[in-house]
């Protein structure tokens, strides 16, 4: 069985979540028997091409490829609002694009429902994202190095967010919370992968240039597991997600997680994460030391259900089913 992976991960797009997911899955499949996997390339012979993006380069690949064409729905119309400019215009093309693939892989119950409403005639299978838990694990040396690099004291409480710098990810709430809790250090890892197409691009660039004293914008860093190890609490104030991969990474590193109460997380994280409705609740949760310790103690074990070895096996089973049908 020959499987070709295709994802548009050039330039800053290499930092978007779907590129991370695709590479992790690709590497794990490469360890398995009875399957040959290749990475991108328009001339790579394949029985099945697994797409993780659907931009112009992917469209060209889709037109010239002869094998089965599978797309993972990392992006849906819901997550474009507050994320990129001209979202309403772009969202109109989703049904037409999705119908051009033989099979759709959805990554969460809410993602599955949204795609079903959009293309009810298209066959689809839900397989969640997976992570390499060997890589995403706490390291004391990583913690010290990260804090030293960014001038964070050993006793400082660090609230970490890993996300694109966009309104949809809850950037403005993050800044409001930082102002309300000046005794804590607030670290945001991530950049603007869509460049000038990002929502509120100029405003966010100004904010990044002049952060508050207790706020650190690291931009992209070589290994985000360093940031997870250096933090005490993970916060994701995002208003919409298809899965929430960074939550899973944080849990694997043993962090307690506070996240906005949005439907995308239902059926994925259960009661392992602490949900909030407004900023007042976040402030209160950050002071719940005993509760945060309780969630941290069970975080690593919880993440095992999304170990990449299991997720890769599910993908391989689907590939076989599609090629045999």
Model-predicted segments: where are they?
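Membrane-proximal helix-turn-helix segments that form the acceptor-binding/catalytic region
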Residues: 87-104, 205
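Glycosyltransferase donor-sugar binding loop
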Residues: 131, 162, 185-201
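A charged, aromatic-enriched C-terminal amphipathic alpha-helix characteristic of glycosyltransferases
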Residues: 17-20, 291-324
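Aromatic "clamp/platform" in nucleotide-sugar-dependent glycosyltransferases that forms part
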Residues: 220, 239
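A conserved mid-protein helix/loop that constitutes part of the nucleotide-sugar donor-binding site
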Residues: 20, 157-160, 166-180
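Conserved acidic donor-binding segment of nucleotide-sugar-dependent glycosyltransferases
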Residues: 270-291
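A short, active-site helix/loop in glycosyltransferases that binds the activated sugar's phosphate group
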Residues: 99-125, 131-135
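Short hydrophobic beta-strand element within catalytic cores of glycosyltransferases
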Residues: 256-259
């Amino acid at each position: 069985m020959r499987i070709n992976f295709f994802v548009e991960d050039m330039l800053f797009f290499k930092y978007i979540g779907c590129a991370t997911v695709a590479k992790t899955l690709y590497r794990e499949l490469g360890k398995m028997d009875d399957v040959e996997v290749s990475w991108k390339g328009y001339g790579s012979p394949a029985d099945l091409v697994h797409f993780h993006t659907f931009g112009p380069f992917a469209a060209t690949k889709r037109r010239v490829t002869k094998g089965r064409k599978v797309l993972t729905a990392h992006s849906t119309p819901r997550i474009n609002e507050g994320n990129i400019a001209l979202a309403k215009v772009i969202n109109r093309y989703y049904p037409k694009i999705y119908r051009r693939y033989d099979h759709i892989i959805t990554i969460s119950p809410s993602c599955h429902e949204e795609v079903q409403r959009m293309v009810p005639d298209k066959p689809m299978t839900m397989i969640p994202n997976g992570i390499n838990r060997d890589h995403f694990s706490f390291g004391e040396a990583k913690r010290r190095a990260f804090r030293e690099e960014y001038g964070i004291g050993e006793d400082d409480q660090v609230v970490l967010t890993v996300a694109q710098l966009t309104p949809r990810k809850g950037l403005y709430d993050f800044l409001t919370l930082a102002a309300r809790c000046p005794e804590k250090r607030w670290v945001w890892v991530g950049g603007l992968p869509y460049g000038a197409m990002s929502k509120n691009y100029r405003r966010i660039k100004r904010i990044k240039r002049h952060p508050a004293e207790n706020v650190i914008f690291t931009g992209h860093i070589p290994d985000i597991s360093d940031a997870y190890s250096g933090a005490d609490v993970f916060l994701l104030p995002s208003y919409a997600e298809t899965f929430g991969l960074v939550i899973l990474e944080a849990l694997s590193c043993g962090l307690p997680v506070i996240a906005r109460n949005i439907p995308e997380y239902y059926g994925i994280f259960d009661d392992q994460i602490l949900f909030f409705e407004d900023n007042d609740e976040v402030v209160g949760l950050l002071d719940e030391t005993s509760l945060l310790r309780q969630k941290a103690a069970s975080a690593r074990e919880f993440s095992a259900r999304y170990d990449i070895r299991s997720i890769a096996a599910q993908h391989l089973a689907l590939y076989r089913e599609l090629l045999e049908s």
